[in-house]
Amino acid sequence: DEKNKLMSLLSKHGAILFRGFPITGYMHFDSFIKTFGLTNFPYEESFSNAVRYKRTKRVFTANEAPPSVSIFLHHELAQTPVYPSHLFFYCENAPEKNGETPLCRSDVLLSKLQGVIPEFVQSCEKLGVCYANVMPDHEDNKSGQGRSWYSTLGVSNKLNAERKLNTLG
């Protein structure tokens, strides 16, 4: 079964890169993702504030910031309490210049950090990590994280935003 072979390779290597794979558009990509039988992840529930457009219930654009905005290496959806078990990336429109999707295995990075700066790793394990995310009160499509807190939280006012955030702890 090809699906099981791919999932085994994914587990072993952390990522699979398909080059020249015959995907002809986002609908075809959606069908490809569906064959894996994974639980669908609704982006709307993620609390990510990147501006993305929904193509299908499984496919969203990566980020609608202009090409001049640098988006640095980051853990996808790390700042959110709800996240998918797997991520699939597909390039529908290649940029005219530059354009990269760097991948980094967190387990490998952690192992290297433990070898180079173990005191830092121990400090993080002891103290934990806290994310602060300041969101605008209006949409800003010129930013890599330009969804407003209204849109990100799916609310219409501050009171409902506070209620929603309080349910998350």
Language-model segment annotations:
Residues 1-169:
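Non-heme Fe(II) oxygenase catalytic core, chiefly the N-lobe of the double-stranded beta-helix
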